[in-house]
């Protein structure tokens, strides 16, 4: 998945939003472009479990410059509730999960994720 997402950037994509495993995964900046490896499911039918990680349903909005370089973004955290659909996560668990996965899986991914969901590039020193 990581190789494919980077292949997409290498071949002209400005943003990659991955999907598939029904759970959130890490995010990263690669060559000044934003990659979200998976945002889980936003609205799941009754046949699929929405317990725990399977219920996390973030929406990530990103801003780029005219050349497609990532400027900043925001995670809008939602959690699915059976029979009710997605509801805003007021506990912070969704943002914390994405930050933890990003720190663990891609060593921070060149991004800083704040508690309020703001996503900014780590300044190069």
What are these regions (language model features)?
Residues 51-125:
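A short C-terminal boundary segment appended to hydrolase-like catalytic domains
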